Amino acid sequence: MAFVEDKGTVYFARFPVGVAAPSSAVVKLLQGLFDRFVDHSFFILRQRIYTTAGLTEMCRGMVKVVAKRITENIRPRDHGELAGLQFVEIGDASQILLPVAYLSQENQKSIQEVAGWLGSHAAVIPARQLELASGLARWVPRGSVLHDYDRDIAAFLLNDQGQLLSYGVNSNSKNKTLHAEVNLVQRLHRETGRPIPAGAVLYSTHKPCKMCAGMIYHWCEDPSQLKVYYSVEEKGGLSRQTVLDQHGLNHHISK
């Protein structure tokens, strides 16, 4: 379980024990709060989050990017009746991945359609693959008020035979957890139930932030056999010294 209390309301999410997925009680809580409350979530998430589980790199990364503070491994005990508190569950205990309302249409094309588009543009070397990622990013609608639109960021994942496994584009204008790489990894789980296989290569227009890097690393069959290529070096602390950097998995290729 993970929970946060704000102004007399306890928001909580539960996750099945022993289930492996690119999700957790913490991830469900954060994704669900943004899906329900959008920008007001930032006010709720100024408060400390608590979880009964130990933190994974995935959980740590998501908290660093969209929340503030978290305490892990708390032990529940009966405090008796807590008058004046309201309890709001985010999702239900049986859900692995929380359905989200703000996943853009650009994220819902079939793998076959995207694979066909990639296959129509011959690409072998990483620099050329990153050009194709930039092409996918151009699917994201943009406008003059940048805050109101998703960022033009895209990523795709190939297996060791060069076949497309998943893709994602940024859709975080309302739900701040829905970065391109998060969408990619969670789609892979929804459609296959399997982790990123050994020998896979992920191409992203931008360097994965700590949230995305944590989820990628968490949902790898063998992280030591993964390569991540990106072209845009993101500025700011949220993309510095990620778990992918620490394990030498990131490869920067500038345009």
Regions found by a protein language model. Give the residues of each.
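Zinc-dependent deaminase catalytic domain
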Residues: 1-255
